[in-house]
């Protein structure tokens, strides 16, 4: 099946109602159907391919991709696909400063690791019941917000965002730090300042699944390529 047909099947072409449109998205709109903007997939296909290729190249060069999707219908998909390809993710709430104040975030990640170790080795059980429950609640709270980035080990090389409106703070932080931004941009969104714009439906579960599967597959393929290059380098060194 062609990429265009896959996008049609996933409903990528359905935008928002005309009343909510952002005029800056005009060049990516094909027309209107029953008051809803239809996205021009002839524009989306090459832009999406460019974005997927960029993600693959970044990973092949040893880079990290941070997937961001905190809206209800994106949460489970973003988490599952990011885990499948071994990349960090934020799927519940974007903490202000998650990128721009990463040093502080890193301290919270260390705290989470310490508490998890205490739970695993039984240290928590030696505390009073009140202290134990407080620490368990802290673990749950930190895990929910930071669980997806606790293995990130530093700032990402790029972020992939589902819904540029919802995740505008994440985008602003990435831009401030010179981190490349890949984003699904619907007809009600502002495409300005996004490095890799993907005009498309950012609400439908089918569309979100389509994007995330393609990105995760690109990461997995690139990781295989990266490992093959490393193996060749090792062989050359031993020769």
Curated annotation (Swiss-Prot):
Keyword hit for Transmembrane: no
Which domain of life does this protein belong to?
Answer: Bacteria
InterPro entries according to UniProt:
Ribosomal_uS2, Ribosomal_uS2_bac/mit/plastid, Ribosomal_uS2_CS, Ribosomal_uS2_flav_dom_sf
Query: Key word NADP present in the record?
Result: no
Q: Which PROSITE patterns match?
A: RIBOSOMAL_S2_1 (PS00962)
Q: Which GO terms describe its cellular component?
A: cytosolic small ribosomal subunit
State the Pfam families in the record.
Ribosomal_S2 (PF00318)
- For this chain's UniProt record, which GO biological process terms are given? translation
Instruction: Locate the transmembrane regions by residue number.
Output: none
Spell out the molecular function terms from Gene Ontology.
structural constituent of ribosome
This protein's UniProt keywords? Ribonucleoprotein, Ribosomal protein
Q: Which PANTHER family has this protein been placed in?
A: 30S RIBOSOMAL PROTEIN S2 PROKARYOTIC AND ORGANELLAR (PTHR12534), SMALL RIBOSOMAL SUBUNIT PROTEIN US2M (PTHR12534:SF0)
Family the UniProt entry places it in? Belongs to the universal ribosomal protein uS2 family.
Protein name as annotated: Small ribosomal subunit protein uS2
Q: Which organism is it from?
A: Francisella tularensis subsp. tularensis (strain WY96-3418)
What does the organism's lineage look like at the top? Answer: Bacteria, Pseudomonadati, Pseudomonadota, Gammaproteobacteria, Thiotrichales
